[in-house]
Curated annotation (Swiss-Prot):
SUPFAM superfamilies: Molybdenum cofactor biosynthesis proteins. Belongs to the CinA family. This is Protein APE_1980.1. Coiled coil: none annotated. It holds the Pfam family MoCF_biosynth. PANTHER family: NICOTINAMIDE-NUCLEOTIDE AMIDOHYDROLASE PNCC (PTHR13939), NMN AMIDOHYDROLASE-LIKE PROTEIN YFAY (PTHR13939:SF0). It comes from Aeropyrum pernix (strain ATCC 700893 / DSM 11879 / JCM 9820 / NBRC 100138 / K1). NCBIfam families: molyb_syn (TIGR00177), PRK01215.1 (NF002291). InterPro entries: CinA, CinA_Arc, MoaB/Mog-like_dom_sf, MoaB/Mog_dom.
Length: 268
């Protein structure tokens, strides 16, 4: 596909690495960023360790237009994501009045005051601006550095999604490439992925703006089930949809020739 602005997702949390928590945030963000027109180039998971966070953020700076971290924004000792971001930027942490007001307001509504641990959530990398958390206590942060927009979001999925949609998405739309992205697909029954492969390859050659991927769900032999997803980019929604449908038609022809059937369809 044509080159688009790159995005990196850096997930922070020991609980992700030891398998205690499934990283649904990365999948959710990957989908949203792709539909905005960014090319998600890398998803990395690191422990709650300042040096590891700084290393990955530092690698992303200048290489990815958008760098999003998730997790590690809370009040506890192991919430160190913003320290890692600050280290990568070569900056210190600074108490941000706007972020502090967000934290104060959250706890005030619950009849609670500020403590040292709660104030910690308002310490942002120097030069960063807070992202309001519509659901929880910890603000996010966003900063431009070395050609990259670095945004830090909470790890709790409901908080992360709300902050992305309300606070970060408008910023991303300003730097997203022009055009439209369409994603759709079909579920193919009775055809092994290996038999379908030549048709998928043919579909992917419809246009450099089209990406076709097969996902086998059943066994290769016996009762094969293959989901085929098509992602198309174009200058308008209509053009993107037309490209996607053209690619899907190649796959449909293959299904028919191979004696299979389509059990589900996700329209473009």
């Amino acid at each position: 596909m044509e080159e688009h602005p790159r995005a990196w997702i850096i997930s922070v949390g020991n609980e992700l690495l030891i398998g205690r928590t499934i990283n649904t945030n990365a999948a959710w963000l990957g989908s949203r960023l792709t539909l905005l027109g960014f090319e998600v180039e890398r998803v990395v998971t690191v422990p709650d360790r300042v040096e590891d966070i700084a290393e990955e953020v530092g690698r992303a700076l200048g290489r990815a237009r958008v760098v999003i971290t998730t997790g590690g924004l809370g009040p506890t000792y192991d919430d160190v994501t913003l320290q890692g971001v600050a280290m990568a930027l070569g900056r210190g942490l600074k108490l941000h009045p706007g972020a502090l007001e967000m934290v104060r307001r959250f706890y005030s509504k619950r009849g609670l005051g500020l403590t040292e641990d709660r104030v910690k959530m308002a310490m942002l990398p120097d030069g960063a601006e807070p992202l309001e958390n519509p659901v929880g206590a910890a603000p996010g942060a966003v900063v431009e550095a070395r050609g990259s927009l670095v945004a830090s979001l909470p790890g709790v999925p409901s908080e992360m999604e709300a902050m992305f949609e309300k606070a970060l998405r408008p910023l991303l739309e300003e730097i997203a490439p022009p055009g439209a992205v369409v994603e759709c697909g079909i579920a193919v029954v009775g055809v092994p992925e290996s038999s379908l492969a030549p048709y998928i390859k043919e579909a992917s050659r419809v246009s450099p703006r089209v990406y076709v991927k097969s996902h086998p769900q059943g066994s290769e032999i016996g009762k094969p089930l293959v989901r085929v997803r098509v992602l198309a980019r174009a200058s308008t929604l209509e053009e993107a949809r037309a490209e996607a449908l053209k690619a899907l038609e190649k796959v449909r022809r293959g299904v028919e020739e191979l004696g299979g059937s389509i059990s589900e369809e996700d329209s473009c």
